[in-house]
Amino acid sequence: MNGSFLAGAPRCADTGAQNAHLRRFPRPSSVDVRTKYASLLGTSGALHLGIFDPPGTGPVTGPCGLEAMIEIDGSMHSGSGTVLRYAVALAALRAEPLHIRNIRARRAKPGLRPQHLQAVRACAAFCGGRLQGDEAGSREIVFHPGRTRRGGAFRFDIGTAGSATMLAFTLIPLALFAETPCRFTLTGGVFQDFAPGAFHMRDVLLAHLEPMGARVRLRVERPGYVPKGGGKLLLEVEPLRSTLVPLRRLEPGKPRRFRGIALASRLAEEKVAERMAARCRELLAGDVPVEMDVQQDESALQRGAALYLGAETSTGCILGADQAGKRGRRSEAIAEFVVSSLQEDLAAGATVDRHLADQIILFAALAGGETRYRIPAMTDHVESNLRLVEAILGARTAREGTVIAVEGIGLKP
């Protein structure tokens, strides 16, 4: 493959631009056919992995016959709950035990929060695994994944306004490798700060997974906001029929259409949704069409609002930005933030937005071949996820400037 990791020095195969050499992240060195060791340094310490075998070969044993276990420092790079979610999902796919410590060590309230607790418990329930240390506030857990992936119907309630969309993100890769279709009913927060909303997940992430061969549907049954939560998502995942197809997105193109959703719950009199939509149209006025879907909702447990805006480009790229409402946050300010965020990513020449930049890494690492795309900027989340898929799955990753490359392991369903 031209420009692949497997043929000499890798290059960015971007037409219209000079090929650039990619910097490889360090890879675990082989000890023998079945066993590898690795030590990958993070910004606040090391990500240490115990003995583990190449993907697909099953569990191995370490010295004295002890079961091998993946050891991860949860404070690496972003030190966020994303490290935990990624690690648990990847360990479940490998069916290998995981010990993760220093969970969310950099956060004001470190340790497991309800949404993280539900994510690891959901993974365990789905694959028939066992957990140790799974309690609120815990800074370390041990996860022994099972090998069952039967599919079926599942219900998970976070019990707070914690992100149900991030729970969905944790479950999607596991469900893709289930024996039968999966149907998840997820209750919690659907639109809040510090987590992409459900519209972004549906219209951006799932839109990119479809050409990779993943059939995933997401529907908002009821919006949920901070602090009451109570939102409901319906997530349906079909098992993969073949290995995921790698994604190539190197030409950003020009915006050819903007499409947005302005949602307001129990705020019809204040015309919050209409004001967000109107401000978006004002800021985007020009030759590019702007389509805004104004939605009024009365089913949420509280007042709330959310705005999503997506851009479709001439080369088929889809980028998005969103923000939830908050007390004291004006409708017009929400629109200005969302439009500005999207325009910044487009101006950077990115082919994916700042959220998809790290979200797509896990799926690229599972695909059979090399995925390449341009990100708006390097972030701790991107760095963390690249290192995790290298270390746990054995995927190869590289970057040059804002070009990310991931050589997937080709995990078969």
Predicted segments — roles?
Residues 130-134, 181-182, 213-223, 284-301, ...:
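Flexible, glycine/charged-enriched surface loops at secondary-structure junctions
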Residues 194, 211, 244, 249-354, ...:
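Conserved mixed alpha/beta catalytic, RNA-binding, or beta-rich assembly cores of soluble enzyme
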Residues 84-98, 122-125, 145-148, 164-185, ...:
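Proline/glycine-anchored alpha-helix kink/cap motifs
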Residues 149-152, 157-161, 177, 204, ...:
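Phosphate/diphosphate-binding glycine-rich loops and adjacent basic-rich segments that engage nucleotide
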Residues 116-217, 234:
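A generic, well-ordered mixed alpha/beta core segment in the N-terminal half of proteins
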Residues 373-413:
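C-terminal functional modules
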Residues 68-94:
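N-terminal basic/disordered segments at the start of proteins
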